[in-house]
């Protein structure tokens, strides 16, 4: 571990992560104008947030800091790539990791690996979909747009909340905390379409005040000690590419998983590539649509 990394990472093992995140959630709901307006102005300057992209550019119009952080953008701020059978990025950020999965093993950083089984909360059967598949990790910093959108047309299958730690998910922590994405609190969201299945995972982090989806509402910060599961197969919840599906407060990470051969370009994106929601990530490989994923979810 690098000298400076030691002082950035080790304290995270010692602090009350969930208590601090609940405190951040409370602070982000403060409505006193002089507090929330000055906080927004300060952080806009520190993180160089482009307020001109916002649907509402007037800081005073946001009821609290959370409303600003999850602000809507102007309709033309994030055009959705129209390429047929292509995935667009579900979020703003950088591609912090893009890889072909080796069996069930994913590389987090040099000397650090984690397994599909662990990432997916111990769901060994579901993990079989993604053996030798492709994966991309998008890191959202505090300056980024914090709404999550559909990468492609699909039907919602199910969702699982997995409790866990709340380490930061910045590059320093990724380098030094083993199995970070498989140990942090997360939402595992399963989708299916005519191409088969895919998975989008929202990973929590320290000071991420809450995670929420449009179909289930706010999931955190009410920490749950056990895995929670929701099945939507009977609800017929279908979404189009570019539809909003969830939100983060502050910054965090989205992990995408695709089965082997379905989205080969997903695992070949250059590391640290900046990306905006709506820009193309990769395209589905051409194949006979009558041949469906043999591990189609049940």
Swiss-Prot record:
Its main location: membrane. GO terms for biological process: phosphatidylethanolamine biosynthetic process. Pfam families: PS_Dcarbxylase (PF02666). It catalyses: a 1,2-diacyl-sn-glycero-3-phospho-L-serine + H(+) = a 1,2-diacyl-sn-glycero-3-phosphoethanolamine + CO2. It is a peripheral membrane protein. Pathway: Phospholipid metabolism; phosphatidylethanolamine biosynthesis; phosphatidylethanolamine from CDP-diacylglycerol: step 2/2. The active site is at 92 (charge relay system), 149 (charge relay system), 252 (charge relay system), 252 (schiff-base intermediate with substrate). The modification Pyruvic acid (Ser) is found at residue 252. Binds 1 pyruvoyl group covalently per subunit. This is Phosphatidylserine decarboxylase proenzyme.
């Amino acid at each position: 571990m690098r000298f400076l990394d030691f002082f950035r990472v080790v304290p995270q093992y010692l602090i009350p992560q969930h208590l601090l995140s609940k405190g951040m959630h409370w602070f982000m709901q403060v409505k006193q104008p002089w507090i929330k307006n000055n906080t927004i102005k300060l952080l806009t300057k520190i993180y160089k947030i482009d307020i001109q992209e916002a649907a509402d550019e007037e800081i005073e119009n946001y009821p609290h800091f959370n409303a600003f952080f999850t602000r809507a953008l102007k309709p033309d701020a994030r055009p959705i790539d129209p390429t047929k059978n292509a995935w667009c990025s579900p979020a703003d950020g950088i591609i912090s990791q893009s890889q072909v999965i080796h069996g069930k093993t994913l590389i987090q950083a040099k000397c650090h690996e984690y397994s599909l089984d662990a990432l997916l909360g111990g769901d060994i059967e579901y993990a079989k979909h993604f053996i030798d598949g492709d994966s991309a990790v998008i890191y959202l910093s505090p300056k980024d747009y914090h709404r999550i959108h559909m990468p492609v047309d699909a039907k919602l299958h199910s969702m699982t909340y997995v409790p866990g730690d709340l380490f930061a998910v910045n590059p320093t922590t990724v380098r030094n905390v083993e199995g970070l994405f498989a140990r942090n609190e997360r939402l595992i969201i399963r989708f299916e379409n005519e191409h088969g299945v895919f998975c989008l995972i929202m990973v929590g982090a320290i000071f991420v005040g809450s995670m929420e989806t449009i179909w289930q509402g706010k999931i955190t910060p009410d920490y749950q000690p056990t895995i929670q599961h929701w099945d939507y197969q009977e609800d017929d919840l279908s979404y189009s590419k570019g539809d909003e599906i969830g939100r983060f407060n502050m910054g965090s990470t989205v992990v995408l998983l695709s089965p082997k051969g379905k989205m080969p370009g997903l695992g070949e994106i250059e590391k640290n590539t900046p990306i905006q929601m709506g820009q193309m990530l990769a395209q589905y490989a051409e194949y006979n649509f009558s041949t469906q994923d043999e591990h189609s979810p049940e």
